A protein has these predicted regions:
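Small-molecule kinase domains that catalyze NTP-dependent phosphoryl transfer to phosphate-bearing small molecules
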Residues: 110-153
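Glycine-rich phosphate-binding loop used to anchor ATP phosphates in small-molecule kinases
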Residues: 47-88, 97
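Conserved beta-strand scaffold positions in the cores of enzyme catalytic domains, especially
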Residues: 23, 28, 94, 138-140
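Conserved phosphate-donor/acceptor-positioning beta-strand/loop module used by diverse small-molecule
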Residues: 88-107
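Conserved nucleotide-binding/hydrolysis micro-motifs of P-loop NTPases
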Residues: 29-30, 76-78, 99-103, 146
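Conserved substrate/cofactor phosphate-moiety recognition/catalytic segment
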Residues: 6, 13-58
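P-loop (Walker A) phosphate-binding loop of NTP-binding proteins
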Residues: 3
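C-terminal alpha-helix
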Residues: 153-161
Length: 161
């Protein structure tokens, strides 16, 4: 979890084979309406995100039901979003990829993304509710290190039960 540009996709893809999990990019689960809205530089509302979050939760529960592990890259910016994702899934774990606005802005302006312009980064930081101590299923990882170091730190956290 984390704002756009925090490395969710890159880290998720690198971590998945390490922990024998399927990688699913939550960006690919957005409705066309949401994609069009973001491409136009319009931030998503809670209502816009609801169906997307419900689909992500469903995909996660399906993996649990089949006894398989998955990594779903998803912003999960608010605690209420994370709570929705936790519904009927006691095995869910979150990895919060934490970085400063300046670091992530620098990254996001150097990449090409199909629909997420750098102008929306501020709205993501404005929406972000960083996980607190009451969210025991969240591990916070600083992204101010290399991809292999981040993957190693997550793998050592032993999130798969």
């Amino acid at each position: 979890m984390g704002v756009s540009g925090s490395g969710k996709t890159v880290i998720g893809k690198a971590l998945a084979p390490r922990i024998n999990a399927e990688f699913i990019d939550g960006d690919n689960l957005h409705s066309q309406r949401n994609v069009d809205k973001m491409a136009a530089g319009i931030p998503l509302t809670d209502a816009d995100r609801l169906d997307w979050l419900l689909l992500i939760a469903k995909v996660g529960r399906e993996h649990v039901a089949h006894g398989t592990s998955c990594i779903i890259a998803c912003s999960a910016l608010k605690k209420s979003y994370r709570n929705l994702l936790r519904t009927d899934n006691t095995t869910i774990r979150f990895v919060y990829l934490k970085g400063s606005f300046d670091l992530i802005y620098d990254r996001i302006t150097k990449r090409s993304h199909q629909y997420m312009p750098s102008t929306l980064l501020k709205s993501q930081f404005d929406t972000l509710e960083e996980p607190l101590g009451d969210e025991q299923d969240v591990v916070t990882i600083s992204i101010d290190q290399s991809i292999p170091e981040i993957v190693e730190e997550i793998a050592k956290a032993d999130l798969i039960s």
